[in-house]
Amino acid sequence: MLAIDQGTKFYIKLNYPLSNFGTPAIIDWGFFKLLFVENKGMAMGAKLNDFLPFISDNTAKLILTIFRLIAIVGLGYWLWNSIKKQTHPLLNWALTLIFAGAIGNIIDSVFYGVIFSDSYGKVAEIFPEKGYAPLFYGHVVDMLQFPLVEWKWPSWIPWIGGEKYLFFQYIFNVADTAISTGVGILIVFNKKVFPKSI
């Protein structure tokens, strides 16, 4: 999973410039689009300083990256311990998917700023003389979108009435899919993977 994630990200970065709003998708099949965007924050583009406005973008990015590294260590320990204790295979699969996805995204955050040039209006170069950001300040590469249904909210609904809405508008990557699948397994099969102690 990690190899597929990094392979797709390298392919996108080394073959396409960043997708800007209004520019055509790399692939557009209606229900599926292949794009190239970079996420400087966390899920759905949110940044830590969106919630804590008194910290700078750089401080927010560093805190987020350090938190992700600590979470990966904890997740790795949980996975190692689960395998050692021979817990339910679904738990091990779920944790492996989450761990691989987390590693995939942390590679982007920690190293991509150093090993790639920027992609604004041009295709990135690998191992340039100077990368687009220092170590720990890279951006996560996202490229997959499934815009399934678009509608306009009825005008009588407060705050959002008359607004257009696109379901599933978010752009994500293979690592995000692995994390979501792992979490989904834990939720759907929670009674199997977390049996009650007697």
Question: Language model features by range: what are they?
Answer:
Residues M1-I198:
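Alpha-helical transmembrane bundles and membrane-interface segments of multipass inner-membrane proteins
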